[in-house]
Amino acid sequence: MRINTKIRYGLRTMVVIASSTGTEGVLQKDIADSQSISVKYLDSIISYLKLKGLIINAQGKRSGYKLARPADQITMLDIYTAFDRIEVVECLNNENLCPRKNHNCKANRYWDSLKTDFTTLLKNKTLSDIMN
């Protein structure tokens, strides 16, 4: 399983925003500069994080960004699923893709267990944990 670039940049963005102590939030340009991410690409990262309700504008349009809730209430699962669903193998999310769906596939149970374990791992790690 690979963690895609949007998830990695999303986490880095969240860490930068969470590290800010000011009330005015962190400007997108400052995040882009500090993380060597193009402003254009970061625009899409910011959109996903806002849509998921993880960040908000600090003081309206053209202001910086801040966390929508405290860092200890934002999990890695929140960040991960802002960009992608957890998919270990395709047949777990779409049983019509599996020709063995009616044959009690033992491998499917293993993949499902792996997905559950990975989800739990993400759910149990907060942004605050990562920063400390």
What annotation goes with each model-predicted range?
Residues 33, 50-51:
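Alpha-helical residues within the helix-turn-helix
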Residues 26-36:
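A short alpha-helical element within helix-turn-helix/winged-helix DNA-binding domains
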Residues 68-132:
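Non-DNA-binding regulatory cores of transcription-related proteins
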Residues 40:
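Key DNA-contact positions within bacterial/archaeal DNA-binding proteins
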Residues 46-47:
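Short, hydrophobic-biased segments on the C-terminal half of alpha helices
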Residues 8-22:
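Short amphipathic alpha-helical interface segments
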Residues 54-67:
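Beta-hairpin "wing" of winged helix-turn-helix
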